């Protein structure tokens, strides 16, 4: 309860600051580009009379096909329908931000809004930064919103330590046994070491090799070193690693999910928050990996079964290869740049 209260207070303070700080900047430029979590952006763009490109890394547009991506149970339910869940999400967002937004809108001579979720989506140019082949779209969007979808904006210019990369590649290439990569990305979990311990023991039994992306949280730091384990302590870009792995187990962030899909590898997701359960569900629906597991609850025997399926199931490999070709055909960075430039003309 206290954590939620702090989040609400921080969000409201951020909205006040954004109106003050961003308006002078936008007045000197042509287009505002901001994430869907920048709650003040629609009002700022309206005041400056400038186009607003509202981006998101998951389908955060109200619809009738799927629940909100932040909802922890992403499979559509015939009783608790997606439409009902979107209404519930809008109530929460209205409680958090509507009064603060309207206070600032009145200050700048703008009409108040009645529903933040609908107002933000309807008064923006919505650009979805995920693959149409990996995420979903909803037919009702065409009737309600201005929207486009361009694919993931992969960052292949990420700087890395060449020596660390060569050390990793030497580990991967020294044997022919399957290689699993595990990462929690920029997230963490109180159960990360328990989960890493299970991964290491299972890999030892099955003669897999395990690479753990340690990250800022130092995931895997308690693991005992052995010839089947590589603890990656320096950041190395995913596009240089994943093509050399047999499968990836990860937290389900949009970027990591897309990177594994682009590499054409099966994946198993251990979602922690926000849209991660959604991407875990999509991985299962598309047949590029098994049903997601909860890092805090999965047993070692269940995880071992999932890992064996992940490595050996030929359908995952076939579907992942097909998905890779589709994602490779998208030009995410080029698409959003062209879209922004079209609005700035």
Describe the residue ranges of each PLM region:
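Conserved nucleotide-sugar donor-interacting segment of glycosyltransferase catalytic cores
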Residues: 13-83, 133-134
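Nucleotide-activated sugar donor-binding and catalytic core shared by glycosyltransferases
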Residues: 25, 68, 81-130, 173-174, ...
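Short His-Asn-centered micro-motif
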Residues: 34-36, 184, 250-251
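Generic beta-sheet signal
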Residues: 35, 55-58, 129, 149-150, ...
């Amino acid at each position: 309860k206290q954590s939620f209260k702090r989040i609400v207070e921080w969000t409201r303070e951020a909205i006040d600051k954004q109106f003050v700080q961003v308006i002078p900047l936008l007045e000197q430029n042509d287009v505002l580009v901001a994430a869907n979590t920048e709650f003040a952006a629609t009002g700022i763009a309206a005041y400056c009379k400038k186009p607003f490109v509202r981006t998101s890394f998951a389908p955060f547009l109200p619809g009738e096909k799927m629940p909100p991506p932040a909802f922890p149970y992403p499979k559509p339910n015939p009783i608790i329908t997606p439409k009902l869940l979107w209404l519930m999400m809008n109530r929460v967002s209205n409680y958090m931000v509507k009064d603060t937004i309207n206070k600032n809108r009145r200050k700048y001579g703008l009409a108040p809004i009645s529903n933040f979720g609908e107002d933000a989506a309807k008064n923006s140019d919505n650009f979805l930064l995920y693959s149409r082949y990996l995420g979903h779209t909803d037919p009702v969007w065409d009737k309600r919103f201005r929207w486009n979808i361009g694919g993931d904006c992969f960052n292949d210019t990420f700087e890395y330590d060449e020596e660390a990369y060569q050390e990793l590649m030497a580990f991967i290439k020294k044997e022919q046994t399957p290689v699993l990569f595990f990462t929690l990305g920029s997230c963490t979990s109180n159960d990360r070491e328990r989960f890493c311990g299970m991964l290491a023991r299972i890999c030892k039994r099955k003669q897999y090799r395990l690479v753990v992306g340690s990250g800022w949280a130092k995931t895997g730091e308690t693991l005992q070193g052995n010839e089947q384990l590589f603890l990656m302590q320096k950041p190395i870009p995913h596009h240089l690693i994943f093509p050399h792995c047999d499968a990836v187990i990860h937290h389900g962030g949009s970027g990591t999910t897309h990177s594994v899909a682009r590499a054409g590898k099966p994946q198993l997701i251990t979602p922690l928050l926000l849209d991660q359960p959604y991407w875990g569900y999509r991985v299962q629906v598309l047949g590029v990996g098994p049903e997601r597991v909860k890092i805090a609850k999965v047993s070692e025997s269940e995880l071992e079964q999932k890992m064996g399926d992940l490595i050996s199931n030929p359908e995952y490999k076939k579907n992942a290869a097909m998905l890779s070709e589709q994602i490779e055909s998208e030009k995410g960075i080029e698409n959003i740049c062209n879209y922004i430039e079209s609005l700035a003309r």
